[in-house]
């Protein structure tokens, strides 16, 4: 379990909207405890994400 950017099948990082609701829902549906949308880059950042769902620098 880790905190980090969520990795999705169709994108290597999940883009989100400023309010973060979509990000929180996606993180929880993928096993995370919470999620928010970063202001820089509008990318979804998750807390408590399973290792296989988290983006790693070697992921694409």
Swiss-Prot record:
Identify the main location: secreted
Name of the protein in question: Putative insect toxin Acra6
Q: Which family does it belong to?
A: Belongs to the long (4 C-C) scorpion toxin superfamily. Sodium channel inhibitor family. Beta subfamily.
Record's subcellular location = Secreted
Organ and tissue specificity: Expressed by the venom gland.
Query: What pairs make up the disulfide bonds?
Result: 16-37, 23-44, 27-46
Superkingdom of source: Eukaryota
Q: Name one GO cellular component term.
A: extracellular region
Listed SMART domains: Knot1
One GO term (biological process): defense response
């Amino acid at each position: 379990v880790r905190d980090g950017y969520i990795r999705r099948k169709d994108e290597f990082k999940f883009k989100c909207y400023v309010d973060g609701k979509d990000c929180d829902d996606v993180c929880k549906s993928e096993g995370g405890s919470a999620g928010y949308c970063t202001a820089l880059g509008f990318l979804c950042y998750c807390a408590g994400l399973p290792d296989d769902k988290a983006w790693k620098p070697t992921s694409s």
